[in-house]
C-alpha cells in the first residue's frame, strides 16, 4: 500500500455487492443502501487535542467496518480502487 493517511483519515476498500433481478439484470448494490461494508487497509496517527495530546483512532488495519454510503473520496492506489474516509464516517466495527 502506497497510501499513508494523515490525522483521522482511514483508507478502506469497500466490498462490492451486486444484486440481480428475477430477469437477470444486475443492479448496483450500493446505489440504494444507506450503509456499506469495508475493510480497513490503513489508518492515520489520530488527532491532537488543543493541549497537543494525541488521541489514537478506534479502528486498526484489518477491521471490518460499516460506513455511511457516499462517505469519503475514491482514489487509485496502483491498480486498486480504495476510499479515504474520516473516522466519524464509520458507524460501527463489525465483529
Curated annotation (Swiss-Prot):
Gene3D superfamilies according to UniProt: GroES chaperonin
GO biological process assignments: chaperone cofactor-dependent protein refolding
One Pfam short name? Cpn10
Listed GO CC annotations: cytoplasm
User: Which residues, if any, are the signal sequence?
Assistant: none
Q: Which GO terms describe its molecular function?
A: ATP binding; metal ion binding; protein folding chaperone; protein-folding chaperone binding; unfolded protein binding
Where in or outside the cell? Cytoplasm
UniProt-listed SUPFAM superfamilies: GroES-like
- Entry-linked InterPro entries: Chaperonin_GroES (IPR020818), Chaperonin_GroES_sf (IPR037124), GroES-like_sf (IPR011032)
What are the protein's UniProt keywords?
Chaperone, Cytoplasm
Q: Major place of localization?
A: cytoplasm
Similarity comment: family membership: Belongs to the GroES chaperonin family.
Q: What is the purpose of this protein?
A: Together with the chaperonin GroEL, plays an essential role in assisting protein folding. The GroEL-GroES system forms a nano-cage that allows encapsulation of the non-native substrate proteins and provides a physical environment optimized to promote and accelerate protein folding. GroES binds to the apical surface of the GroEL ring, thereby capping the opening of the GroEL channel.
Alphabetized NCBIfam families for the sequence:
PRK00364.1-4
Q: Which HAMAP family match?
A: CH10
Complex and partners: Heptamer of 7 subunits arranged in a ring. Interacts with the chaperonin GroEL.
Q: What is this protein called?
A: Co-chaperonin GroES
| Species per Swiss-Prot/TrEMBL record | Streptococcus salivarius
Lineage of origin: Bacteria, Bacillati, Bacillota, Bacilli, Lactobacillales
Q: Which gene encodes it?
A: groES
